[in-house]
């Protein structure tokens, strides 16, 4: 299969200066993630302004739960992205095409499964999370409608992951912008005009997700290279499924472990009542915009590292890691400082209540300022996954981020002197320090192994060059 002659959206990750291309990849991806967050932010703002604090708490309290239920399958999309990027870097077009068709069919199966689980289990899980009784019905309704559109969500995420494997982060941005505009308009119409409350914002989100999924599928169908989607070739290739799962399941488990810990944290937040819940929900929405920058540099690091790993350029991989981490930390801390400085104004967008704004500022001061630590933790994982280390970061995350949070909340937080909301929030920076330090130590040893592979690879090439003249003489 021939490569597409139309390479406007592709980025050459194998040659040239790294930083400009890294930014060209990461900036549209950051904007794309921010647009996705605007879907949720629009939900939160419209509900907070026109439906009340109970509805705001109902929508916000679902954030961690939605992440918990979807992260395993979004991890599989990371596996598809890494595998596709390796084949792209190695110019193995037939294998890339098989990866595309396996990934799309896998996304459909994943979406259907999540829809069933989300609709049937919504109320039970929310009760387990200690969702207050006066919020429970609204939260359950929102969650069930949201998960009705999960097939479209999975389809978009897998499709966008495949496009990113070639360096194309621009078209997913355009598609999210189009669907985001529709989402905001429908939010206003359903809630203000039809008085549909949380059902309206959930329905608007589902419709917008369907639009973005349709656009990304259309894009893949119109491709002329190995990324082209042909519905007649849709099938699960067992080897490709195994390879996707080898990368994606550890990534998904890591995401689920994070989310499980966050659900536990959310349960602790819920115990302080509706005002703290609403303030925390609004602050989480702001923090997610900061995290979008971290996620962009993580995904850039994964894509660049995977392509160069496929091409065998190990020296370039080390440069990519250093530039990704430094740039990710600097830009993240800049966003963090801005979020705290303008915190009262930003939180005021979500709720007119002074008590809710004050509660949100407590969270921002204890968590947002330390997101640079999270950047180190997450971005360096991209280097490990890009060179094939998938289990290691999962185990580090299990112990450093998840176990430490659960231990803190079940021990220190339970002491009367420390049983206050600040002691819930501090668990984030503490776990980031522990996990980031461990990831850096792991990367040190992995990079030494990569150096040995480089020397062995160069020695093998030199030996082949020495043998070539002898073969010619014979």
Region roles according to the model:
Residues 29, 33, 45, 82, ...:
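Transmembrane alpha-helix boundary and packing residues in multipass membrane permease domains
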Residues 77, 145-164, 175-183, 201-216, ...:
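Short runs within selected transmembrane alpha-helices of multi-pass transporters and secretion channels
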Residues 13-50, 64-79, 83, 108-115, ...:
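N-terminal transmembrane alpha-helices
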Residues 1-26, 84-149, 182, 193-249, ...:
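Short alpha-helical transmembrane segments in multi-pass integral membrane proteins
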Residues 56-116, 153-172, 279-343, 374-397, ...:
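Small-residue-rich hydrophobic transmembrane alpha-helices
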Residues 24-43, 145, 156, 179, ...:
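Transmembrane helical elements of multi-pass membrane transporters/channels
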Residues 34, 38-57, 126-133, 189-196, ...:
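Helix-terminus/linker motif at the lipid-water interface of multi-pass membrane proteins
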Residues 51-64, 139, 143, 202, ...:
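Small-residue hotspots at the loop-to-helix junctions and early N-terminal turns
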